UniProtKB/Swiss-Prot annotation:
InterPro entries membership: AMP-bd_C, AMP-bd_C_sf, AMP-binding_CS, AMP-dep_synth/lig_dom, ANL_N_sf
Binding site for ATP: 198-206, 338-343, 424, 436-439, 530
Protein name according to UniProt: Probable CoA ligase CCL7
UniProt record similarity statement: Belongs to the ATP-dependent AMP-binding enzyme family.
CDD domains: 4CL
EC code: 6.2.1.-
């Protein structure tokens, strides 16, 4: 095997220590998360940054036990689906784990969804019960399903409580009676624990089936570096949505199973994030590229003491080298690193090793322990060696079981050898570091050349007067497609279209040059921080 991890069989293998998974095949992800909690019962597990409500690990476990019995008393049975439709709060992980501990399957949904969008997920997943907040009740009442109201205002919702089938979180806990242990439910690690819907940036979202083993494996991969460093107590701020795999599996579940503290924040607010980092002495802040952009471009950052930060991690979309280096100046005593994962991989494929040695700034790091990969030629479907660009295929114990009720999509994504075809374009360098270039479907086809929008976007936001940018293909009779940019200027900027074109032209090959630049107020993005390129393309083409 080469130092890149590349073998003669065309497979890249992790260069990290082997992944040791629990041998008990009947272990649930809930039992796993609390396996060591008796060693630190009074340690804060969850803190609500909006209300300051705190649950110690002892209280957290006790509440999950009560909630799991509460769900059973409401008639929830093994393999039933329960929908969580709520913004972040400490009640979300409690309910998520309570659902799973009862033997049911948790599915989560974006609280910004319209009734129409939510209806599609309800129709697909067929939940028996909905967990939401009073503020969102109007969106779910038409489904006529039993509903649990959670959150700080749930006890003040007496008009809603008078409705049939509506209970509060307090009612759910009370239903359990005096219980002190989890329900007697038979589990296998291979059982389905959650149904998370992919963001659908390139089409209809699909239900990703994740098992107990997927969550357990992913959580160990994510926290391995902390274990190797012997770190005892870290504090993570979770403002990324818990309905998404990044907020749920990578930040919340993975860190709780290690005994770290997770601070829940209901919605993104840059100044509130900075205040909370200072107030709670946050050590780890995991973000998406738009937040890195905000941190580097906003002068408000200088008002706050961020010295507790040891680590800023970014995921969900590629992050350019220039932006990473700018962000690193904000945390001189910490490290800015990047990882790569997707819902289908329970959130992780690779992450940078930040424990010293040569940095490969701009890469998505080395394969996580237990993960294998291939870089496959888009044309020949043959595996490629280091420094060759192709589609990223991955496999390992964290890979999804498939798409819910969608065997055709499953077959197109997972092949007979267990490889998950990510649809992402990338390559490994000679040291085994993965570079994710872009989505294959989003490449701009210019006269036979392929132009990656993410590369141009990374260059654009490195300009001091550009706050954000998106690049999309525009139909062209001669070239097929040409790259055009939509740019958000900083306040008081006098930047012109020609200025932007020249800035890019001096850094790229001629076929990558921008043919048009339009200035806009904001770039459309999903809740997980991914650019909604498809929405913009459809809007632009409808006006041609």
């Amino acid at each position: 095997m080469e130092k890149s991890g590349y073998g003669r069989d065309g497979v890249f293998r992790s260069l990290r220590p082997p992944l040791v998974l629990p041998k008990d095949h009947n272990l649930s992800m809930v039992s796993f998360v609390f396996r060591n909690s008796s060693s630190y019962p009074q340690k804060p597990a969850l803190i609500d940054s909006d209300t300051n409500e705190t649950l110690s690990f002892s209280q957290f476990k006790s509440m999950v036990i009560k909630v799991s019995h509460g769900f059973l008393n409401l008639g929830v049975q093994k393999n039933d689906v329960v929908l969580i439709f709520a913004p972040n709060s400490i009640h979300v992980p409690v309910c998520f784990l309570g659902i799973v501990a009862s033997g049911a399957i948790a599915t989560t949904s974006n609280p910004l969804y319209t009734v129409s969008e939510l209806s599609k997920q309800v129709k697909d997943s067929n939940p028996k019960l909905i967990v939401t907040v009073p503020e969102l009740f109007e969106k779910v009442k038409g489904f006529n399903l039993p509903t649990i109201l959670i959150g700080p205002n749930s006890e003040d919702s007496s008009p809603l409580k008078s409705r049939a089938k509506v209970l509060t979180f307090h009612d759910l806990v009370t239903l359990s009676g005096p219980v002190s242990d989890f329900p007697m439910v038979d589990f296998k690690q291979s059982d389905t624990a959650a149904l998370l819907y992919s963001s659908g940036t390139t089409g209809m979202s699909k239900g990703v089936v994740l098992s107990h083993k997927n969550f357990i494996a992913s959580s160990l991969m994510v926290t391995m570096e902390q274990d190797q460093a012997g770190e005892m107590h870290n504090v993570f701020l979770c403002f990324l949505p818990m309905f998404h795999v990044f907020g749920l599996a990578i930040i919340t579940y993975a860190q709780l199973q290690r005994g770290n503290t997770v601070i829940s924040m209901a919605r993104f607010d840059l100044e509130k994030i900075l205040k909370d980092v200072e107030k709670y002495k946050v050590t780890h802040l995991w973000v998406v590229p738009p937040v890195i952009l905000a941190l580097t471009k906003n002068s408000i950052v200088k008002k706050y003491d961020l010295s507790s930060l040891k680590h800023i991690g970014s995921g969900a979309a590629p992050l350019g080298k220039d932006l990473m280096e700018e962000c690193a100046k904000i945390v001189p005593h910490g490290i800015v690193a990047q990882g790569y994962g997707m819902t289908e991989t329970c959130g992780i494929v690779s992450v940078e090793d930040t424990r010293g040695g040569k940095r490969h700034t701009g890469s998505a790091g080395m394969l996580s322990s237990g993960v294998e990969a291939q870089i496959v030629s888009v044309d020949t479907l043959k595996p490629l060696p280091p420094n060759q660009l192709g589609e990223i295929w991955v496999r390992g114990p964290n890979m999804m079981q498939g798409y819910f009720n969608n065997p055709r999509a499953t077959k197109l994504t997972i092949d007979k050898k267990g490889w998950v075809h990510t649809g992402d374009l990338g390559y490994f360098d000679e040291d085994g570091h993965l570079y994710v270039v872009d989505r294959i479907k989003e490449l701009i086809k210019y006269k036979g050349f392929q132009v990656a929008p993410a590369e141009l976007e990374g260059l654009l936001v490195s300009h001091p007067e550009i706050l954000d940018a998106v690049v999309i293909p525009f139909p062209d009779a001669d070239a097929g497609e040409v790259p055009v940019a939509y740019v958000v200027r900083s306040p008081n900027s006098s930047l012109t279209e020609d200025d932007v074109k020249k800035f890019i032209a001096g850094q790229v090959a001629s076929f990558k040059r921008l043919r048009k630049v339009t200035f806009i107020n904001s770039v459309p993005k999903s809740a997980s921080g991914k650019i909604l390129r498809r929405e913009l393309i459809q809007k632009v083409r409808s006006n041609i």
